[in-house]
């Protein structure tokens, strides 16, 4: 049984990356006092040496969408600047502010997404095709990171199930595999193992078919009523609100239906820490910190922190618990 304690930045950052960063800063002559700063402040010091002339992302374009009452939460939304400024997207850096700082030049014009594998109708659609073919709706979802922090986010998108049905899956299709864009020139973390966390790219994820067909599973193309900014996974990303955030793969270019369980990036990198299912569960701790509570990202700063109990399946048990009936959630984390 793991002791419940408040995670430190060394905890929520993989240990090898945490200490590698400190070695680099020491090699640059950074003082011991500077090394005691939070990782975000240390990143600012590194940025001083690297330069910070990064292109800014264009403003998001307004989207047309419905607002079904079924998907509204009686909870305050996380401020937009926190949703777009506090992100994990290692293709653009390890710190929470790195994606917003480094992803502005991501080119999404003419973006296509390929759907193939065990389907009767393989497809390649561009983002405009998707927006025309599948009506958009706003869904306000809880978002829970495996690092024990949470947000409430108004996504705009359409059900993943609609795209899968359009491709006509065969009876062999038991899983859905996803892949992020692989473009090291645009995504510097893919060519710099320090900047990209030492992960193997492209980033890949997967769901069971019944999970993918659940009405909660969303392909999001927008947030706060506008097209997604690059740091949030433009132009299209997965949102599965009952799972930890690392399952919510960003900047998708390929969806493949398959009979075999697909590989998943974090599960490959650290299988004892990041499971295939990644369902939010307050009773199953991460090996290095508790999942019983979560830090709510709100309008205040780091010193104005609210914690709340974590809900099983992130509060979506009524919609998804039946998917895992008879499954040991501790072993299949």
From Swiss-Prot:
It is found in: Periplasm. One of its GO terms (biological process) is protein repair. Its cofactor is Mo-molybdopterin. Binds 1 Mo-molybdopterin (Mo-MPT) cofactor per subunit. It is an enzyme of class 1 (oxidoreductase). GO terms for molecular function: metal ion binding; molybdopterin cofactor binding; oxidoreductase activity, acting on a sulfur group of donors, quinone or similar compound as acceptor. Mo-molybdopterin binds at residues 87, 90-91, 145, 180, 232, 237, 248-250. CDD domains: YedY_like_Moco. It catalyses: L-methionyl-[protein] + a quinone + H2O = L-methionyl-(S)-S-oxide-[protein] + a quinol; L-methionyl-[protein] + a quinone + H2O = L-methionyl-(R)-S-oxide-[protein] + a quinol. Its EC number is 1.8.5.-. Keywords: Metal-binding, Molybdenum, Oxidoreductase, Periplasm, Signal. Pfam families: Oxidored_molyb. One of its GO terms (cellular component) is periplasmic space. Predicted to be exported by the Tat system. The position of the signal peptide cleavage has not been experimentally proven. InterPro entries: MsrP, OxRdtase_Mopterin-bd_dom, OxRdtase_Mopterin-bd_sf, TAT_signal. Residues 1-43 form the signal peptide. Heterodimer of a catalytic subunit (MsrP) and a heme-binding subunit (MsrQ). Belongs to the MsrP family. Part of the MsrPQ system that repairs oxidized periplasmic proteins containing methionine sulfoxide residues (Met-O), using respiratory chain electrons. Thus protects these proteins from oxidative-stress damage caused by reactive species of oxygen and chlorine generated by the host defense mechanisms. MsrPQ is essential for the maintenance of envelope integrity under bleach stress, rescuing a wide series of structurally unrelated periplasmic proteins from methionine oxidation. This is Protein-methionine-sulfoxide reductase catalytic subunit MsrP.
